[in-house]
A protein has these predicted regions:
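Ser/Thr/Pro/Gly-biased, low-complexity, turn-/loop-rich segments
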Residues: 1-206
């Protein structure tokens, strides 16, 4: 009797053996009664070719083992350039977009689901960033952060590690070009969770 295909992708050797045993014992009673045993081993993994394009330091086509992931590929390609997006890395398979990777999810939340396992002839495309927002002063990790259109000042504060212990928490100064003029306004704390930063904004936490 045909047991059909068994997907072992991403499993350890022990978990793969358990899954195969559970599948086989439905067909072969000897396995369930422990009169017959199942052994598995891993041979040399097959090679896959991955294309990496866009804002990486060493774009091109690379050979990997079949167990490699998107982040491994970016590392081998020399990492991303200064102008690269971290929020919109695209993975194409068979000429179709199958995943849009937001590295911030991994860096800030530990969400490893974005580290997709690669398959032969995949294309990784790293575009340029859309906009970056600066935040300086009394935050734990000041700097420039790439922001999505729907994100708020509260999101920016989270990316910057939050306010420092000695920060003035009631408001944050925003420097923005409005009607061709540079203006400074205060954003009060009750606005943090809905105020949306724009490209070129500079926030200062006192």
């Amino acid at each position: 009797e045909n047991i059909g295909p068994v997907n072992l992708n991403g499993l350890s050797l022990e978990k793969a053996k358990l899954r195969l045993t559970n599948r086989f014992k439905k067909v072969y009673p000897g396995i369930q009664s422990r009169k017959t045993f199942l052994n598995i081993s891993v041979g040399i993994p097959r090679a896959i070719r991955i294309n990496i394009a866009g804002e990486v330091n060493l774009p091109g086509t690379y050979n990997f083992s079949a167990f490699n992931t998107l982040y491994n590929a970016l590392y081998v390609a020399g990492g991303i350039t200064e102008n690269a997006t971290l929020r919109d890395i695209k993975l194409f398979r068979n000429n179709k977009l199958i995943s849009t990777v937001d590295v911030y999810k991994f860096l800030t939340e530990g969400d490893g689901s974005s580290n997709v396992r690669l398959e032969n002839n995949d294309l990784i495309l790293v575009n340029t960033y859309s906009n970056r927002i600066s935040i300086d002063g009394a935050v734990k990790s000041p700097g420039k952060f790439e922001m999505k259109d729907e994100e708020t000042l509260l999101d920016l504060l989270n990316y910057a590690g939050g306010l420092s212990e000695n920060a003035f928490k009631k408001s944050i100064k925003l420097t923005r070009i409005i009607d061709g003029q540079l203006k400074v306004v205060d954003i009060n704390s009750d606005q943090f969770d809905f105020f949306k930063p724009s490209a070129g904004d500079v926030f200062q936490v006192d």
